[in-house]
Amino acid sequence: MDNKIILDQTYFYPTSGGQLHDTGFIAGKRVVDVFKQGNVIIHVLSGKHEFPEGEEVECEIDLERRLQLAKHHTSTHIINAAARKVLGNHINQAGAKKDIDKATIDLTHYQSITDEEIEQIEKEANKIVKESIQVQSNFVPRTEAEQTFGMNIYQGGAVPGKLLRIVNIPSVDVEACGGTHLKNTSEAGEIKILKATKISDGIVRLYFTA
């Protein structure tokens, strides 16, 4: 554990939900990885440290990286909603990965997505971006969230816990999600869908940037 550190509280986001971790510094030492083990968040440093237990440390997050990951995460929600509008209500997220350079979203769909449909989804997604909609996030008891928003809040799989963080883009998309997000859809800039690939029966993967 001499290159790993556990804090009593942290702003660093661990790799989770298909989103990569934050990087930055703890007491001037570079943080190269952050992951969750059970209920504990572990920060991996680039070298050994000698912090005694109980020492107070200053943390600094790489905000440029955080913003880019947030762009791709919010854009995942936007594209999911846009695809549902273009292709039909059977569309759900089956998985996603948010990286720095690009991101992917896996959608439930019974056939390959055509170039024309990709263009329509991209157009609809950028329409949502240009509408400059505030992205809301609140913690809501599970039962209340399910009764208010329905079971479609579970995109990409069930979320554990009695209290859910609900990310709501009003009139666009509502999901239970623990990831980092933009404050407004306009911050996503331009969404560009690079390609679509059928990865298995009933699952199509979209590659995109924002």
Where are these regions (language model features)?
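A glycine- and charged-residue-rich anion-binding loop/surface
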Residues: 1-210
